[in-house]
From Swiss-Prot:
TPR repeats lie at residues 342-377, 460-493, 494-527, 665-698, 705-738, 740-772, 814-847. Keywords: Cytoplasm, Phosphoprotein, Repeat, TPR repeat. Coiled coil: none annotated. The modification Phosphoserine is found at residues 632-633, 637. It comes from Schizosaccharomyces pombe (strain 972 / ATCC 24843). It is found in: Cytoplasm. GO terms for biological process: endocytosis; intracellular protein transport. GO terms for cellular component: cell division site; cell tip; cytosol; plasma membrane. It comes from the Eukaryota. This is Putative cargo-transport protein ypp1. Its main location: cytoplasm. Belongs to the YPP1 family. The keyword Repeat applies.
Length: 862
């Protein structure tokens, strides 16, 4: 009989081995041998195991700082190699043990330790020759059971290293079977957890080549992910390996299958698809944990791969706002872990543009462009004759020219449409021109259309900004040529067709514009509401107002806008409409009023305009747009109240002295101009959301004001000054700094014979918006026709205003050229007067019912 101490130390050794407390094992083994000499074999075996696994544990900790591709791509690298100076003595000790006197359990343990020694020595043939098999061996949650699992997993690694993939896969399946049959709890023994983790990570990796179907692989990955979700991993590296395989699989499935594919209805695939945001974010967090300091060159590999996979998945799924913001924050974390990783900033540009953070996208783009330029300079130096002097330059991940062009095309639209930055547009144009020349990209059919299209957008914007007629004409020709070259290679490029049609229409080539926009709508009838709006305005140029109204009605039917029911209710289905589509519908409603006015007169238009307000409230979920206002101490925010919506008819009953905010259709506060504070590039999730909702709220507010201004204009034309004033008060409540409020108020005062007051209001309007051609022309007309002040001074100022107007945004406004002709006539310059009169007539013959600038967005994503 052995003493109680012997039994105690035997249990202690078992417990210590299962817990992986390798430093304590030598002392426990010594005491066990002292009290029970018959346990000498297992004691020596335990000490060999402790020495070996202590070295492995230390090496695994170093892996976090050297996360190399071979570590994850080669499964056997998950067990690090150890120097022979460390392992040879251990193997000699193992060989010296008298295995003949060992029990069956001790023999199993010896085999597992021998396998581990062969693996760390990279003696894979010797490991395979052991011909280990777990078949028929009962499994228990003891040190022997752990060794059985360990030997099975190591045999799989050895077979894989010898290119016996099928045998390796069968071994790892056996290991998974052992784990599943054992029904291991959520908190297994630490050493058992280590080998379970490794088994599942190998299972996930080997599924790449071993599975006969994508569905089978999805099932395996789901099983592996479920294990790591339910169990706390001892080594996060194994969880990282599994997550990486799941992300790669999901990206492949999404990229190679359409959204309606049947594969997404299968349970395991559906589960991965529905949980992709959490999978991606968890994997990104693991990468951050495994990268403890900034990495450069090849060590960026996994971060760069993650960015590419996450971006591809995002592109091929529903791009929800919250998920996009989470990805942005993850990328910002990676900027502190990677060095010169262009892909981070490339994806940031896409994500930030999607959530409409255009200024921040611009900052990311500037960094991206800087890194691209520097990396290409490095490559150029390395490929030069003096490359040897630059041998210290670390390798970097350089974006392909095609990727650079794609990012530039996105930012070209941002700078042209949203930031209105001519300098940046010119810089991008120069940059892509240089890249196209350096890499001869115009000969590549996969990228040349995008280059031509981006150039077309640049020249269109330059055309719009030009204040020199000859320069404007040159930019027009260049933009048309660029779009045409794009369409030669991609005849059905809808965005290019739209941009070309817009360019023709703005240049008053109406026939060409109509031909192109009809071609666009044949390719895709539901391309955009703006494209139909463009066709309507083109039709109105030839005074086909009834046809334009019919087109608008057909658009309403196509996009789900139904007529008012007999009981006054409206049936609307807008579930598939984006926010921009809804905004475009509102502008289309205003154009419908303009067409009615041109076709049937002002009074007939007044009878239908109340429907516009009702539709407006139906198009937008007004309760969704809560916006904070600055500048009011007693009222910091207001709610868009659906219940307070009133028709325009009710405004007819408002007396002219009403100054309070009662009766406002949307109940916006009096002061709606907002001053956006400067924010850091890494905003909180709530900050992004607040800014996004604020922009949306301001847009809805702007459209609401636009409707009131339209109503005020109609009332003025009908001679209803009181109703016009009431409508203007409503518009002023929304934004008291709106130039058109003062413009229409000025026209109202002039209509009442109050010339001085009217002039002052027009002067304020011009001060607030000196670039608005209609305001400038109205002020010039007032100066020329007014009876106050010296005629020569009034004429000189009118001349200056009209000169600026006709050179810039009012070059195509007939009224501006008419009053310019009047000035020349008064000055006796009949030649210039005749030219201006003639140009006025030409423009009037092709004048739409509303200006082209009402078509927004002017530039679609290239």
């Amino acid at each position: 009989m052995f003493s109680a101490k012997a039994k105690t130390y035997e249990l202690k050794l078992e417990q210590t081995r299962c817990n992986g407390d390798w430093q304590a094992i030598p002392e426990v083994a010594r005491k066990l041998h002292k009290h029970n000499s018959s346990k000498s074999f297992v004691c020596e075996l335990a000490k060999i195991e402790a020495s070996l696994k202590s070295a492995l544990t230390a090496e695994l900790k170093n892996i976090a700082n050297v996360l190399e591709p071979k570590l994850i791509d080669n499964q056997y690298s998950l067990i690090p190699a150890l120097p022979s100076a460390r392992t040879d003595p251990l193997l000699s000790q193992l060989n010296s043990l008298n295995i003949q006197n060992a029990t069956e359990d001790e023999k199993l343990q010896e085999t597992s330790i021998r396998l581990l020694l062969y693996i760390v020595q990279r003696k894979f043939p010797e490991a395979v020759d052991l011909d280990w098999s777990p078949q028929g061996i009962p499994w228990t949650e003891t040190s022997t059971g752990i060794c059985i699992l360990q030997a099975t997993v190591l045999s799989s690694l050895a077979q894989y290293a010898q290119a016996n993939d099928e045998v390796a896969y069968q071994y790892v399946r056996s290991a998974i079977g052992l784990i599943q049959n054992a029904n291991i709890g959520k908190k297994p023994l630490p050493e058992l957890t280590r080998w379970c983790d490794l088994a599942y990570s190998l299972y996930a990796q080997m599924s790449v080549s071993a599975c006969s179907s994508q569905l089978e692989r999805a099932n395996i990955l789901t099983t592996c992910l479920s294990y790591f979700t339910e169990h706390k991993s001892v080594n996060l590296l194994y969880k990282l390996v599994t997550s990486r395989q799941a992300i790669k699989y999901l990206e492949h499935i999404l990229r190679t299958n359409t959204n309606g594919s049947k594969i997404f209805t299968k349970s395991p695939v559906k589960n991965l698809y529905l949980n992709w945001p959490q999978l991606v974010l968890d994997y990104g967090s693991l990468l951050c944990n495994f990268t403890s300091f900034p990495k450069a060159g090849d060590q960026n590999m996994f971060a760069v791969e993650f960015i590419e996979l996450a971006t591809s998945i995002w592109i091929n799924t529903e791009k929800s706002y919250d998920i996009t913001v989470s990805l942005i924050r993850m990328l910002y974390q990676l900027t502190g872990k990677c060095f010169q990783a262009q892909q981070i900033f490339r994806s940031l540009v896409f994500f930030l543009r999607h959530i409409e953070e255009f200024e921040e996208a611009s900052e990311a783009f500037e960094i991206y462009k800087f890194l691209c330029v520097k990396s290409h300079e490095r490559l150029a130096r390395k490929n030069s004759d003096v490359a040897g002097s630059f041998s210290d330059i670390k390798p970097v991940f350089v974006d392909e020219p095609k990727s650079i062009i794609e990012v530039c095309s996105v930012m070209m639209t941002v700078y042209a449409q949203y930031l209105r930055n001519l300098k940046k547009v010119s810089e991008i144009l120069d940059y892509i021109t240089k890249i196209a020349s350096d890499y001869d990209l115009l000969k590549r059919d996969d990228i040349a259309p995008l280059i031509y299209h981006t150039e077309g957008v640049a020249y269109s914007f330059m055309y719009y900004q030009a204040n020199n007629p000859s320069l404007r004409e040159r930019y027009h020709q260049k933009s048309v040529q660029s779009y045409q070259k794009c369409l030669e290679k991609q005849p059905t490029n809808t965005n290019a067709l739209f941009h070309l049609a817009m360019q023709y229409s703005e240049r008053r080539a109406i026939t060409d514009a109509m031909q192109i926009v009809r071609r666009l709508l044949e390719v895709n009838p539901k391309y955009s509401i703006v494209s139909w709006h463009l066709l309507v305005l083109c039709v109105s140029c030839s005074e086909q107002y009834a046809a334009g109204i019919k087109l608008i009605d057909s658009v309403f039917e196509t996009w789900g806008i139904n007529h008012v029911n007999e009981d006054g209710t409206i049936e609307i289905s807008l579930t598939n409409l984006t926010f921009n589509d809804r905004c475009a519908l509102v502008d289309l409603l205003i154009t419908k009023l303009a067409l009615f006015e041109a076709e049937k007169g002002v009074e007939a238009t007044l009878d239908i305009q109340d429907e516009i307000f009702t539709l407006f409230a139906s198009i937008f979920d007004l309760n969704e747009y809560r916006i904070s206002k600055e500048g009011s101490s007693d009222e910091l925010s207001t709610l868009l109240e659906r219940s307070t919506i009133q028709s325009i008819k009710s405004s007819k009953k408002i007396s002219k002295d009403v100054e309070n905010e009662k009766g406002s259709i949307l109940g916006f506060s009096r002061k709606s101009s907002l001053k956006r504070s400067t924010v850091l590039s890494k905003k909180s999730h709530s900050s992004y959301k607040e800014n996004f909702q604020l922009r949306r709220g301001k847009t809805v507010s702007y459209l609401n004001q636009k409707l009131w201004l339209t109503a005020a204009s109609l009332f003025l034309k009908s001679g209803n000054d009181d109703q016009a004033r009431s409508a203007l008060l409503e518009a002023k409540k929304i934004d008291h700094e709106c130039a058109w409020v003062y413009y229409l108020n000025g026209l109202s005062l002039l209509q009442q014979g109050k010339e001085v007051e009217g002039y002052e209001q027009l002067d304020v309007a011009h001060y607030l918006d000196p670039e608005d051609p209609l305001i400038s022309t109205a002020l010039a007309k007032c100066l020329l026709q007014g009876g106050y002040g010296p005629m020569h001074s009034r004429r000189n100022r009118a001349d200056a205003i009209l000169s600026s107007c006709t050179l810039q945004y009012g070059w195509d406004l007939p009224e501006a050229w008419y009053y310019t002709a009047e000035i020349f006539r008064q000055l006796g310059d009949l030649k210039q007067a005749a030219f201006s009169y003639d140009y006025c007539i030409q423009l009037a013959d092709t004048n739409p019912v509303r200006r082209w600038s009402n078509l927004q967005p002017r530039f679609m994503n290239v």
